[in-house]
């Protein structure tokens, strides 16, 4: 039993050590500003019932991922300037895709399809998604947290990261705890293209983007694999010993 507990402790410590939160752009507190994005109450003007929003993130912002890439399991957003708004609301039908793209910040095409990479994967939905501050499991400082249904493998060495959001059935008023933290600065690590109709093939290009906290599970480094290799035999030995009949 002692060996079994020790092995579990080693494995759990390794997993906790591997988890990382990468914020893009990291300097949003200096010169940042509130923006609406595709999730908040200001996303859709009156009589507009859907939206498509793409945002690109420069690959050099993901240096915190070990060599070889990692799995993105969720995204967090910071709410700023609450202004007495409601605590949250449900977007009836939301879909989020991620892909690796050759397009860079301030270089997105106004044609949505031209920005999408070959490894495109649906990571959320399409389904109802609750958007509110202080979501359980949120990264510190980023209260709106969306956990992915399917992780996305991303290797920064292969290109920039594209997030593609389809707000398919957005009501005219989506409650929110406030505006989202973002950055509207040419030459930074993010930019976007958007349209107020999810079916539009083209959109409006803008240098603005939402500050995003990515939760990443990197591929274990060789030292981590060594620890796991040592721990697994301990578990096997403990389980086998426990099953042996006592005289």
Name each model-derived stretch:
Residues 22-28, 157-218:
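Proprotein-processing/basic-patch segments
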Residues 221-239:
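A short, hydrophobic C-terminal helix/tail in secreted or cell-surface proteins
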Residues 4-12, 229-231:
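Sec-dependent N-terminal signal peptides
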